[in-house]
């Protein structure tokens, strides 16, 4: 029985949309524009330890579409998940929280953003898959490796 208690454990407790905002500062006139919009996408990942083995992971997506110099829409969504992570070596928690958890959450974020854009009256925008491992490694390089694993799963 004690062997079972020491087994690595990873569980999704909840996935939820934490926040979403949509702005259309130039509607309805923007709907008359014939030019294709330019689209910028930004993604960020944050993690917070809620309890000894429980983490909230937050994947934020910001999509800005512009026609010429006018903003067609700006949408920001924060997709969150609560994950229970137990009996995982400390040096493996940060990559799990920074790579695996965001990879699980991103399809929900992508769906919520696409739905909001369509409901706002714009053509659908499908966000491409994101390589969260590359994003994680880039973040580590920017931090210069400073206490990345020592943060014990909390990335900022």
Curated annotation (Swiss-Prot):
Matching InterPro entries: SecB, SecB-like_sf
GO MF assignments: unfolded protein binding
Localization per Swiss-Prot or TrEMBL: Cytoplasm
Keywords for this protein: Chaperone, Cytoplasm, Protein transport, Translocation, Transport
Record GO cellular component, one term: cytoplasm
Broad class of the protein's primary localization: cytoplasm
Family indicated by similarity: Belongs to the SecB family.
NCBIfam families: PRK05751.1-3 (NF004392), PRK05751.1-5 (NF004394), secB (TIGR00809)
Protein name: Protein-export protein SecB
High-level lineage: Bacteria, Pseudomonadati, Pseudomonadota, Betaproteobacteria, Burkholderiales
């Amino acid at each position: 029985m004690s062997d079972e208690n020491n087994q690595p454990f990873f569980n999704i407790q909840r996935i939820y949309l934490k926040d979403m905002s949509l702005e259309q500062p130039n509607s309805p006139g923007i709907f008359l524009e014939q030019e294709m919009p330019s689209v910028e996408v930004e993604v960020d990942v944050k993690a917070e330890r809620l309890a000894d083995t429980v983490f909230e992971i937050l994947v934020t997506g910001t999509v800005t579409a512009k026609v010429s110099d006018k903003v067609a829409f700006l949408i920001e969504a924060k997709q969150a998940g609560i994950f229970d992570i137990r009996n995982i070596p400390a040096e493996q928690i940060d990559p799990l929280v920074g790579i695996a958890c965001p990879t699980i959450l991103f399809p929900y974020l992508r769906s919520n953003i696409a739905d909001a854009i369509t409901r706002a009256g714009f053509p659908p925008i499908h966000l491409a898959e994101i390589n969260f491992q590359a994003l994680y490694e880039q973040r580590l390089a920017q931090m210069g490796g400073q206490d990345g694993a020592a943060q014990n799963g909390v990335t900022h």
